[in-house]
Structures are given as structure tokens and as C-alpha cells.
Amino acid sequence: MPLLSLSLLLLLLQVPAGSAETAAWAVTPERLREWQDKGIFIIQSENLEKCIQASKSTLTLENCKPPNKYMLWKWVSNHRLFNIGGSGCLGLNVSSPEQPLSIYECDSTHVSLKWHCNKKTITGPLQYLVQVKQDNTLVASRKYLHKWVSYMSGGGGICDYLHKDLYTIKGNAHGTPCMFPFQYNQQWHHECTREGREDNLLWCATTSRYERDEKWGFCPDPTSTEVGCDAVWEKDLHSRICYQFNLLSSLSWSEAHSSCQMQGAALLSIADETEENFVRKHLGSEAVEVWMGLNQLDEDAGWQWSDRTPLNYLNWKPEINFEPFVEYHCGTFNAFMPKAWKSRDCESTLPYVCKKYLNPTDHGVVEKDAWKYYATHCEPGWNPHNRNCYKLQKEKKTWNEALQSCQSNNSVLTDITSLAEVEFLVTLLGDENASETWIGLSSHKIPVSFEWSNGSSVTFTNWHTLEPHIFPNRSQLCVSAEQSEGHWKVKNCEETLFYLCKKTGLVLSDTESGCQKGWERHGKFCYKIDTVLRSFDHASSGYYCPPALITITSRFEQAFITSLISSVVKTKDTYFWIALQDQNNTGEYTWKTAGQQLEPVKYTHWNTRQPRYSGGCVVMRGRSHPGRWEVRDCRHFKAMSLCKQPVENREKTKQEEGWPFHPCYLDWESEPGLASCFKVFHSEKVLMKRTWRQAEEFCEEFGAHLASFAHIEEENFVNELLHSKFNRTEERQFWIGFNKRNPLNAGSWEWSDGTPVVSSFLDNSYFGEDARNCAVYKANKTLLPSYCGSKREWICKIPRDVRPKVPPWYQYDAPWLFYQDAEYLFHISASEWSSFEFVCGWLRSDILTIHSAHEQEFIHSKIRALSKYGVNWWIGLREERASDEFRWRDGSPVIYQNWDKGKERSMGLNESQRCGFISSITGLWASEECSISMPSICKRKKVWVIEKKKDIPKQHGTCPKGWLYFDYKCLLLKIPEGPSDWKNWTSAQDFCVEEGGTLVAIENEVEQAFITMNLFGHTTNVWIGLQDDDYEKWLNGRPVSYSNWSPFDTKNIPNHNTTEVQKRIPLCGLLSNNPNFHFTGKWYFEDCREGYGFVCEKMQDASGHSINTSDMYPIPNTLEYGNRTYKIINANMTWYTALKTCLMHGAELASITDQYHQSFLTVILNRVGYAHWIGLFTEDNGLSFDWSDGTKSSFTFWKDDESSFLGDCVFADTSGRWSSTACESYLQGAICQVPTETRLSGRLELCSETSIPWIKFKSNCYSFSTVLESTSFEAAHEFCKKKGSNLLTIKDEAENSFLLEELLAFRSSVQMIWLNAQFDGDNETIKWFDGTPTDQSNWGIRKPEVYHFKPHLCVALRIPEGVWQLSSCQDKKGFICKMEADIHTVKKHPGKGPSHSVIPLTVALTLLVILAISTLSFCMYKHSHIIFGRLAQFRNPYYPSANFSTVHLEENILISDLEKNDQ
């Protein structure tokens, strides 16, 4: 039942007051089609071409334009016609039937509201028909016949939109249908509504007035196929199947079947004993009998499941006798009975169970490959069929003897896995004049479970009428197949029959199929799809489909065709002509074959309410009831065509003889029906754009030419080819071969490959512009003259039968497909997610990320074409930990999402890590355990260039004063001194442009570290050169090959909650300077209009001089950064030696506790060029690590997941990343750190024990015994009060560090704990419950806006990241109790006072930055006095208490002597 929001519809139709009937309102066929899909239509007089409009008193005929809401109608319950605008139903006063018709309350009793449509008439009671009087008013009459159609539907009638009952779920109406319309809250609803429900579920009343009767139920939600297991479903965690137990409903079998179908589900099927036990458990011990999907309603077949599950498991009630088994055709399940299945009268009313698959591709997928023809070679006496060989043994044997006989011939007793194999069996038995044969299906179990003797899964069953009929007390049951339709019967295994053996054959090449290239063979015929849309007259002429359109003679042929057309179906509006036509307008449809001969119809496959009318021609649907036949207008309707011709004894037409057989070579592209192949050479794939002549020469090196268009189909293909690669909004222009360069051609345009010019491709206005002699092609089917010397991208063309040459400079990359600045490689073979992560990484790419709807559409179209049937493909989404948020593996932000609603999460207790996938059928995303095997896609942002690149050595140059040297760049950090210096993103970019640069493009981890280390001591974030509308490309045009996106709050948009508002906000890249190491240096998107600092970049000026890296100034042994002093030790040493050496220098092996110092050391190590020992080690094989100087910190910087398990001692490599190795290993250096203060032990003696243990820190005691308790905020608060304590508060940074260190052990078990904070509405601030302000806070990227704070929200600490988060006070979380210590034993150690240190804020490390001037004189590079004080709101929760001081920068110790001189 289509559901439409009444409020939305009325809003669309509303016009300004006073002009409701007169205001112009544009209606397109698309809009009408949307309404019609929802059952809403406009009634038009076929003869008068006017439309029915309702008013308060009468109905009149008015001009259809402009339409309004009072013209909209809908069939509703009890055959009533409901007017949308008037909120009433069409009624007839039977006591005075000649008076004008009017609109009445839909539950009126004094008028008749029932109407029927009969072809094009509207008929009421006593055969009264809706007629029109001369004054255009509507009346009821028996005298005249007036015809009505649906406006703008191509002549369709209003009978096409009949109402279909919606059976309710749950509620109190026992499953009875919704009553439409029903009145609720003084409003008539013609559809289900969410009004009045907090859970937002759709519901309806089952009587006309809800307030009077209060009968209601939930609606079968058509969107539930996308939602998964919602509130009215229960999920089997193991099978990912949802079940709906409607135990309070009472419906017939067909009504129950309809109810399930409306939810994208089916009546219960039971595939095996495990599933039966699951259902039995949920039904309990009550003797309730429920409908399931088992039925024998197909008169020509036996018992089957309504969802096409193979029927090989059976558990019939043993006392079943033959008579009711024959009489009753629907199956029930009774959990109270061990033998739970029973047949019943299908009209009985019972409860029912629905079933749907969370992943529909797991079920019901027809093997398309089963219908593909494979030429096969077999031994003499064996019959070939699609890769297998069969032999009917005409010596009668029992089933077991037949099995042994086949095995002795290296074959098996045949299995049958598809309808295609059934057709072969029928043909073979017919040729052998045999009526029946044993097949390899048998059961040896109780309950009965049929299995194939070769061990293959039972994926298809084809039972005979009344089968499978189970013999009681029979331990072994065997199955035979009969000849007429290939149906199966259960037999006594001791009977003797012929038997069919099967074994693998030798598959021959496709050329031996007997069909031309592009045609598919089935039986003795070849078939082809002409994908060009044509009228029936053109399609059936014999020219495009020689010799004729297809005739279909059996269900097997129909199934083959249904499979064939699925490969080209793109939209629900895809149709295919077949040869069926009512040529004489008699209403009788016959086949129109070659020679205009009429052929009788032996088989039909009509769709619902078909054939609709006489005189039409027949199409086959491509989607939504695929393969079903429908009547369409022969002249005006356009469709593809299905062609058919015999394999042998055919005469080739002239067109067929010239048909190009060759596929395109390498990575050239074409489509069926085109004689040439094309290749687009665009700027991302070549080293440079070219002039027209250069482009033509480029094509000629392949043996090709610039593209020409021999006919419109070639232009259409090229146009679609461009659309498949580039954004439609891009104004790209490509050289093609169209030119008028030849002076002897009198200025006429010609194609460079000699193709005749068959159309005027250029507008007349362009003729005469003599200087523009070459044409470019735009992706909107436009050709423009251009100057031949301008440089463009280009398109080449080559005949199919010509193999392209391979120029020596060409780098072949065929498997990769380009789309919008990235390339994709589709791996069809299935494997685990981690395998593809490795493969993609090895190919210098990443597992697929999807960042826009266009990219989603591109991926979906490709995997749909590559998947033979419904297949899921891995994408790059993965949980870092079970139940964590999904993140792109390459670190890019998750901005665009296309989750199948409810399927991004595991619904059960399974803690396995999950990864994301995309469905080839729906294109929607869902998640699955990462160990499952699926195909996948690699994506590389660095596009492979097909031309071999000539290496041009880079040269270092100079930077202006005030800029920092990094590699070949100059960087300028602009840190505002106050709010007046803040700049928005656009202003920052303008400033950079004025300085000859752009906002920075961070190209690698070392550059990221260099910028981060220079932000130390400042409090502002900085803009970088990214925008959200193209965040895969830097502002300077380079692709984003390195990224450092924040895993939290990637989009940081305050005060805007709706997606619609967010779309209007420009978002730009910001680099965070939050001291919490989870956020330091991370990127996220911020409103471009906000003010921050920024970083500019430009290339060094190498025009004056350059310098060799050997001229770099050496790094000194002692370095100061922040309030720390580092010593670099250069010598071959083990970790133990490094530890002793540091002690000899009055230092310790370095401990790294935040991202700033990590970034500083990253820059140093990259400059030095080899790995160094640091002070981290483990004594428990990598389970936990400690710093050798006793520092406690949760900060880590591991290289990868495995790098912490390779040894007991840790080093930092040249990228700064940590790895463990054997402590006895020799490295070339170590990093020492000089202690700067007396360290304080945070853990003193335990507090005196009560009923729970306490840990003391400073003057407080803490109980961590309740961290794993899961309770609400109020319950946690009360628990602590009873223990004489309070719920946890965090008053300073040291306390925060202590707590997070203690909580580290719990991070895998609990995610969040409660904090004892509350929202002060008067001051709009967060306060601790004791009234003190929250000076120490850690909200991550930014503090939530005031509007987020609501009475029912509480504050929790998220343990893995150390950030605070708002959460419902009713959520279940762990907690910590805190109280003051009885005795304060903490002795305060005198700390050092403020000191001034020299640190290199602008350390230019890997900075092959060097200035070479002839004087080679030296100059000191000085910087002004800078304060490194951290403000309270930017405290680092993990950083040990430290004394930050004011420092001076003396000189950059990493720049070269020459560089110093140049400054």
C-alpha cells in the first residue's frame, strides 16, 4: 500500500489564499507519475478533456490546467473514492439519484459511497454511471456512457489505482485491515500516520473514527525492507533473519501472505531443524497454530515455500491421512507438537509468522550463470550440457545400486540445481523415450531432510503435485524425476528405475556456441537484446532484429529470457518488445513472425490486469515483476527489443554479415551495436594537454584517430562515456576529429579519419569563424569550434577489428577504472576484508571509500554489472573495536553515508569486529563480520598516468623573511594575537594568495609533524587548504594522498541540527591545536566563516641558486623543545646500552607523552635518517608497556597493530612511528631526555577500607570497583551517597591524568562512566554537583552549544578518548565514587619556578631548505619572544603536571649555513 504524507501533498498543492482554483501551477508527467505510484490520480473526461473538481456542494468539470488539490482522487477502503482537497468521499443520494453528485463524510449512512470502475466508466449502485450535464456538473445516470481516464497517463484508466487492504500488525485489532480514510484528531487520514506516537511508527485505525472505537494497529511499513529488524521484528543473531510473530492476528493464508509481502517479507519458511527450533522457542509451549508459507497452490506443481526456499526439510504430523492432505493446500506450524507441520484449509483464519532476510542476497537469488550456454565436449555416449556430461542408464536398478553404478563410472547420480537443468532433463528423457529416472536426492533422517548424494547443497526443488509425500516409518526415502515437466516424486528406494549419471565435461571456447558474437544461445536458438529504444513497428521490421522479434513457447524459455534481460535492466521503466501483437484489433494476441505470419500462442506470462486493452503490442518488463508481459501502444511506446534466430539453416542478412565481432582491446570502450571503440585521454591520465595536431598524432601512435561520429548512437555512447567518468557540472572540452583545416575543402568540416559527415553537428552561428578550424566536444552533446593551437584533452577512436598498437611510452593500466579524480579496481574474487586491505595497500591504494552520492551511483552501477547475481562488496568502513563507530580505513571523514537503515550495527551480542559492505542490488551499505568473504574494490587517489614521466630534479631555493623552510616549500604560520586578527577561511586564502601562495597542502606525515610542533604554546586552530565539497583534492589541485582526519566530530557545526541547514553551511578544513593528544593536529571541518589562524605555503624560489643536501647544518647533540631538553646519542647500541648511556649523560631514555613532542621528534628523526631507541619497554610480551623513567601516560604512536608485539623494547623510526624489537638488537642511536623536575608519585597508600576498596590520590580517595557496574546516573549517584562519598568529579589536570591512567585497564570492557555534573540553567553552564564550576573540562573538538544541554541529559567521561560526552541520564554506564581522605599525607615537593628556556619553535628539519648565495656569509635567524602558556580550557588530560614557561627562540638549528646567511 503506497504511503504518502498528506501534509506534504497538501503543501505542494497549496496556493495563495483567494486563488486556490485559479493560480497557475505547473504539473509535469514526472510529478503525476509520482502521485499515481502512490495511488493518487486526476479523473479526466476522455471526450471533453476536462477534469473532475470537487467543491463543497457539487462536482464539476473544469479545465485540467492548472490542476489543484480538489482534482486529486484516491481509491480507499470499501470501494470509495476519496477527494484529497475536500477530505470527503464521492456519494450518491439513492433517494434522489438524479441530483448532482457531491462530496460527503466518508462514513455517511444516508448516501451510497461505493463505486466501481469498469474499463473507463465509474459505476455506482443500481447501475448508475457518473455522467456530465451540459453545465459541466456531474450527475448519476443510466442513460449515457461517459468514459473517464487518468489525466496525463497516456490513456490509462482509473482502474489502475485500485485500493489494496493493509493488514495491521500488533495493536488491538487482531490484524484486521486499516480503514481509509479514518478520522483522528479532527482530521481524515487517507494513509497511515505517525501522528500521536513518540516512537514514530506508522499506524492506522481499523474503524472510521479512532476516538470512538480506539481500534488500531501498526501499518506494514514499505520502508521496513530498508530498516531491518525494527520494533515489530525479532532477529536470529546467527542467521541474520528477522521474524515477526503475529500471534494476536487472525487472517486467512492469502491475507497473511499479503501482509508479509507488504513488509518486504514472506510467510515463514523453515529450511532446517535449527531454524525450526528457533521458531519453536519463540512461540513457546502454547498450542498455537500459525500459518507458514508452505502451500501447493500451483496447480501444476507440488508443495513449495512462498519465498522460494527449497523444500528439502519436512516435519509433517505423522497421523496425517491422504484425504486432507489432498484437500488442504496450505501449511501450518504448531510449536506444541514434535511433528509440527499440518495442512489446513487456506481460508481458515489463524495467526501467522513473517520472515525476511536482513541481507536479501543471501536468499532467493537465481543463478544467472545456469542459463548461460557453454559449449561442452563429452566422451562418446554422454550428452553435453553447460560444462557437464550426462548419461541415461537404461538398465533398471534400485536407488542404491544406481548410486554405486554411477560412482563406478567416475560420475555421480545426478543432482539438479536449476530450472535450466530441469529443461535439459526433460529434453533428454524425451529423446531417450524414458518417462522417469532416479536422481541423486534422498533422505536418511527423521525428521526428513533430503540431500544430494554428491554432497552439494540443495538450492532448488521441483516437486510433483502432492509431493513430497512422506511414507511413515520409512528410514530411507529416494527421489525420481519424471519426463513431462521434470517434476520430482518421493519413491521407495527399492523400486527399480532408469538412472541418470553426471560428471564434469570439457568446456570449449565461446566461438563454438553456434551463435554470432553478441548473441546468447539457448537450446537450438540464438538470442540478442537490441538495447536501442524503438517503436514496435521499427523493432519488428526484421532489420534491427533479424529475422524477427522473439516468440516464447515455454516456461523454460521464459526463465532464460528473464535471466538474459536482467543484465541490461537499469531502471524500473525498462521494457522489451516481444513478437506478440493484436494485429487485427480483435483482442486476440498472436505472434508476429518473419514474413508477417501469425503463430498461435502456446504460453503466456501476463502481468497483473493484463492484457489491458485490444489493438496493442506486448512488452516484457525488466524490473518489478521482471519478465511479465504488458500491452503498450505500438507506435508511440519505445522499448528495447528481444531478437531470436535459429542456430542452423539461416541466411545471413547484409547487416549481419558486416556485424563487428571483435571486442575492444586493452582498455578501449564501446557498446553492443557499435563498430568502433573509443578511449578518453584526460588530464589526470596524461602528462599534459595537447593541441589538436598533437592529439591526432597521439591517437595515430595507437593506430587510431581522433574520434568521429558515424551516427547518433556513437555520439550518444561518447556522451555517456564522459558522464561515467566526470562530474556533469565540469566544463571539460575534448578534441575530436572534426575540423576544417584543409584549405582545399572550401572550408567544409570533415572527420580526420575519413568518416562521412552525416549530420550538422555545429550550429550555423559558428560557421564563418575561419580562425577556429578544429572542434571540441562537451559532455552535453555540444560541438564548439576552437583554435587548433589551444591545448585540450582528447578522445581517440579505432575500429573494433583493429588491434591498437602499444607505444613504447605507454604504461598499461586496463583493470583500473577512472571516475572523478580517482581510480578503482574491482576484485571479483571473494576474500576477507583484511585480505583486500593488504592487496589494496600493496597496489598503493586503499580499500574503497565513498564520499558522495555521485561516487555511490558510479560504484553501484559497476558492481551491479559485474555481479552475476546479488553480491555484497567490501568497502573501506571498519569498526576499530567491536560496537565502535565505523570509520574509513584511510582516515578520511565519514561524511556521505548510504546505510540500509538499521544495518550499520550488529543487532546482537556478537563482539566480532565488523566491516562495511555495499549491496550490488540496492546499493545500500550494511555491516558484516570482517572474516566473511566478499569481493571488494580498491581505490587510488593518485591516478596512474599512462605516459612515462621524465624525472625533473627538484631544487631547493629561498624563502621570504618570516617564512619557515620545509622540504621544497616555504610555510607561513599566522597565529592571531587576538580576536581582531582572526580570519575566516576565505580571508586566510586571500592573504596567502597575496603572498604568492595558497593555504597549506599537507602532503606527508613529516610535514604534518612540522606544523604541529610549531603550534606548541598557542591556543588557536589553523585553517588548511581543504573544503568539504572537494576534500579529496587540495586547494592547489594536488590529490589528498596523506590525511589526518579526526575520528571524532569530523564536522564541527554548532547551532545547526538539520541536514538541510548543514548543506547550506560552507565547511573548510581546520587543523586542531587541542592539547588532548587524541585531537592534537587532527583535521576536521568547520564553518568557513569562523575566525582562526592559518598556514600558507608556496614553493621555494630556486631561480637564484640551489644547494645540495650535504650542505645542511648538522643537528646538535642537545635540543630544547618546550620545557624539555633532549640529547641525541649517535652510536650502535642495544636498548640496555642506550639506557646506561643516557644515565651517564645525566638523562634518561626519552618518554613521549603528547603529540607536540612526538611531532618534534618525528621531524628530528626524519632529518637524522635512522631509527632511535626510546624509553618504552614491556615485561609481559606486549600486554602492557612502561616508560623507563616512570612516566605514566596513555599516549601511543605505534606504526601499526602488529608493531607492539615484535619485541620487548621500543624504537622510533624515521617517520616517528614506534615499533618494538628485541632489546638486544643494535640501532644507530637513542633519544635521551634530561629530567626537569622531581617526579611525584601519584599513588600513595590506600585509604582505609570500607565495604569497597579505595585508591588514594593526593587528598582524595577513589573506588574503581564500580566501573564495570552498568546503571543509570541517579542510581550511581545514590550508591555513592550510601557509601559516604560522591559521584566522580574532576577538578584539575593532574587528577584527570591519574583517573585516565587507572581507567586504561577498563577501556575494552566499558566505554563511559558518569561524572557528577549538572546544567545550571540560570547561568547556562555546567557545574559540579557541589556547586563548583567545571574549570577542568574536556569536550573534545569543542564544548557543546547551550541548546544541547537539557534536563534529561547528563555528562559522562568517554574512556578511550578521554573526552566528555552528553548522554541520557537513563543510559546504563559505569561509575566511580570519590571522597576526601581521612589523613592528608601528600607532601608537596617544591617545584621549580618559572624559567626561560631556549627552544626551536621553527625547527626546520627535513627541510632541505637551503639558500645558496655567493657570499656564503652567516646570519643569525632570530625570532621574537613567545609565551608558551596553556590556557585552562585547553588542558591536556593525559599530560603529566608540568611547568610551562616563557621562552625565547634564538636560532633555527636545523637550517643550513647558506640558509642562515641568506636571511
Swiss-Prot record:
In terms of one coarse class, where is the protein primarily found?
Answer: membrane
Where is motif Endocytosis signal found? 1436-1442
The compartments listed are:
Cell membrane
The positions flagged as glycosylation sites are 93, 454, 1057
Post-translational modification note = The secretory phospholipase A2 receptor form may be produced by the action of metalloproteinases. It contains all extracellular domains and only lacks transmembrane and cytosolic regions. It is however unclear whether this form is produced by proteolytic cleavage as suggested by some experiments, or by alternative splicing.
- Entry remark concerning the domains of this protein: C-type lectin domains 3-5 mediate the interaction with phospholipase PLA2G1B.
Q: What is this protein called?
A: Secretory phospholipase A2 receptor
Q: Which organism is it from?
A: Bos taurus
Task: Give the source lineage, highest ranks first.
Answer: Eukaryota, Metazoa, Chordata, Craniata, Vertebrata
Gene (name only): PLA2R1
